[in-house]
Amino acid sequence: MKKILLVFTILLAFVISCGKSSDSETLKLNLKEEGKSYDPQLANDSTGEFVDSLVTETLTRQSDDGKSLPGVAEKWEHNADSTVWTFHLRKNAKWSNGDPITAKDFRDGWVRALDPKTAGEYADKLFYIKNAEQFNAGKIKDENQLGIKVIDDYTLQVTLNNPLTYFDSIVRIQTYAPLNKKFYEKVGDKYMTSPETSISSGVYVIKSWTRDSEIVFEKNENYWNKDNIKLKYVKMLFINDPSASVNAFKNKEIDSTNISIEQAKEFKNDKRKILTKDGSVWYMTYNMKNKVLANKKIRQALSLAVDREKLITDVLDNTGEAAYTYTTKGIGIIGVSKDFSEEAGKVFPAYNPQKAKQLLAEGLKELGLQKLPELTMIFNDSGNNKIISEYIQESLRTNLGVNINIEGMTFQSRLDKMQHRDYEIALAGYNGDYNDAITYLDRFLTKDGNNYSDYSNPRYDELVKKVKSSGNQEERVKDMIEMEKIIAEDMPVGLLYYRQNTKLLNPRVHNIVFSPIGKDFVLDNTYIK
């Protein structure tokens, strides 16, 4: 009996020590809710993009300060006018199943992203490539006409429509991920929906997955740079309730979580509380398929009736900044010589309730209406979105005598409604993918996958194409400022603020980067101590 007890004690000690070891190698994050898809050619939300950033590596990767570092490509060069880029892949880059990652894998992934049958919302991110837009539209059927050429197993040559000096930043976007075609054809439509049907070209593999609860990632032992990755595991939990998330942090079930203004009061002098820029611009987006909201003066009236300076001071406790350009300010997006937003100036008009009343009256007259019909604004019910929505609701009631309903829902439900145009007004935000203002401004291009307003302006479309085809930064900035002025006049969105996130971070976590551009988190140098 004593021998049995001794064996049991030893086993228990071993289990406990293993648990402690595992915990010291595991970063635990809360991503609130499941993404719609983790297929890199289909992912279209922040959770999906974060998962893909763990299990997918593209040709280049993002540094802590938002620049491009070698990824699967160990080096690259371009011709004199930046229209032909050649990427040289490292020969020790492997898929998690041991297969080599080749230039053909990138070609296969990009062709799949552009295939009209794939119906990827971010296919337009590849339209820089020669004939990509025509192929996606079905006007060109032969994929060999695309500007994607496999020189050999480890050399990929890409021909662009126009000069693009920052294409090495563009290829960081997950839509540019490689595809292991043999594996993909084996698992079919189950691709990236379970650990068994997932494959990784990146730092981690999916170890386990409990739907709507958690995903555990384990270091990919076939990753070329595995020896320099300190975290063995990343556990991603889905806790959408703000109170439950804070409790999980207190109980050390997660290492970091966003907190609301109200929750931040509890942690007023707590060193675990930090403030980060997340790069997003927030606004009221208007569904212009709605007859009333198709009227520009109505949209202008609603926008001018909300005091965004007061929103920052009175509602958000000075976390964030009132927005006057759609392109987020202060996150490293440079114009000609300084921050693009500063060079553009205060483009969107300031709060003006008198002007708002005048515009409302004129808009109603044009529509032949006596008063504004009942409208509803939807918002995802996390963070500070509810109190922001209530502030907007009260502002419109006080300044315009307009009563709108507000309806909270999950992020995914809000996104689905916007994608299907099953909404009138939505409180929404947008983040850029790379350090250039066009990453924000191209979303108002007619039929862009993120153009949930269904806004269309021929001059704007012309400017987007011009900016994307120009290598002259002074001309590009001039044109992008004109684009800002066009949307400030047409107002497919009513600008509100540039968001900052108040977070709790466990001090055991070191070198985690909360990035305002591209990835939400950069974990390459993160460790637990």
Spell out what each predicted region is.
Residues 221-267:
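Ligand-site clamp/hinge motif
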Residues 154, 160-233, 241-243, 354:
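Gly/Pro-rich hinge or "lid" segments in bacterial periplasmic/extracellular proteins
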Residues 211, 353, 357, 361-432, ...:
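Ligand/substrate-recognition segments at binding pockets and active sites
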Residues 305-336, 383-393, 417-529:
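Detector for C-terminal structural segments
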Residues 30-80, 199-200:
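N-terminal lobe/hinge region of extracytoplasmic solute-binding protein
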Residues 88, 107, 121-182:
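Surface-exposed binding/hinge segments that line
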